Amino acid sequence: MLSRKGIIPEEYVLTRLAEDPAEPRYRARERRARFVSKKGNCNVAHKNIREQGRFLQDVFTTLVDLKWTHTLLIFTMSFLCSWLLFAMVWWLIAFAHGDLAPGEGAAVPCVTSIHSFSSAFLFSIEVQVTIGFGGRMVTEECPLAILILIVQNIVGLMINAIMLGCIFMKTAQAHRRAETLIFSKHAVIALRQGRLCFMLRVGDLRKSMIISATIHMQVVRKTTSPEGEVVPLHQVDIPMENGVGGNSIFLVAPLIIHHVIDANSPLYDLAPSDLHHHQDLEIIVILEGVVETTGITTQARTSYLADEILWGQRFVPIVAEEDGRYSVDYSKFGNTVKVPTPLCTARQLDEDRSLLDALTLTSARGPLRKRSVPVAKAKPKFSISPDSLS
């Protein structure tokens, strides 16, 4: 029986049907783990924390950071435990005063209508949540019962205050507002005013504005110091420009934030080939500001890996003037178009400006036009001579 390898050429094997046989085969490089996800979550797992008690020193923040199921479970258990604890206290008071045996006890009980632990538990719930059915009440017979009544009311108010505060903070957290702050899926590198620039687009879907909005950008990459120390997450700040100078932005409409790649930029030696080979590079973008309606500071984050940066492309315009006002077409928010861009690093472009001149000359000529071929006039099938008219 003939083997499959002998009758089927290698370029038509199933494993290579989607490949080009003329190109060499490369081993797929494992993609670098993100430090910040596209949605802004930090991809960090904390392990082997020895001092767990530090979380209990800030109980309120710990409760707010917990999941909803855990938070509601803790408050439910807090109410049940407090009711059971004070029910035991009320039962002990009634037992010590002899109120559990009405025939043999005192004439005036400490708490009326308590004859068992069940009735003591019901009275504990009535006291703490101020239901007030009226069937059970504390009398003047036992000063200790009056003191326990005051303590249970204070404990109930404290639990209610903490619960309401946690629920309010969890529903009004800053990251809820950040859900409507959007970034472009890809970043681009193209020429702007003769310089290579790293650009991205940011927008706000809500009509309520972000006050004092600022934007920051950092490059995170793995580096090695001259002494041989390996820094897995080396963070370098890079300046952003938005047309008005500084990091402050007026985010009333989508903006294109750009960073000029100059000699002080960590992207100065970045080449187009580095983007295709998944270079160990991540650019983190942080947008921060104050919510106009609530006054809470919010922060939106995203990141771009090397393969999410498009070289030689530019964002399409999405803001147009219609009927006396500006309209934004968010369906084109992340759309880009190709533009002439030198395939070299910013360092090479600064050292050899002729690359830019050649690119400008090529773009000035424009695309090749189809050569017009003159069309020969067709000869008439018959002609009229002057002699035939005479």
From Swiss-Prot:
Transmembrane domains' residue ranges: 66-92, 143-171
Processing after translation: Phosphorylation by MAPK1 results in changes in channel gating that destabilize the closed states and reduce the ATP sensitivity.
Claim: ATP-binding is one of the keywords in the record: yes
Keywords of the record: ATP-binding, Disulfide bond, Ion channel, Ion transport, Membrane, Metal-binding, Nucleotide-binding, Phosphoprotein, Potassium, Potassium transport, Transmembrane, Transmembrane helix, Transport, Voltage-gated channel
Annotated K(+) 1 binding sites: 130
Summary of the function given for this chain in its UniProt record: Inward rectifier potassium channel that forms the pore of ATP-sensitive potassium channels (KATP), regulating potassium permeability as a function of cytoplasmic ATP and ADP concentrations in many different cells. Inward rectifier potassium channels are characterized by a greater tendency to allow potassium to flow into the cell rather than out of it. Their voltage dependence is regulated by the concentration of extracellular potassium; as external potassium is raised, the voltage range of the channel opening shifts to more positive voltages.
Protein name: ATP-sensitive inward rectifier potassium channel 11
Organism classification: Eukaryota, Metazoa, Chordata, Craniata, Vertebrata
Gene that encodes the chain: KCNJ11
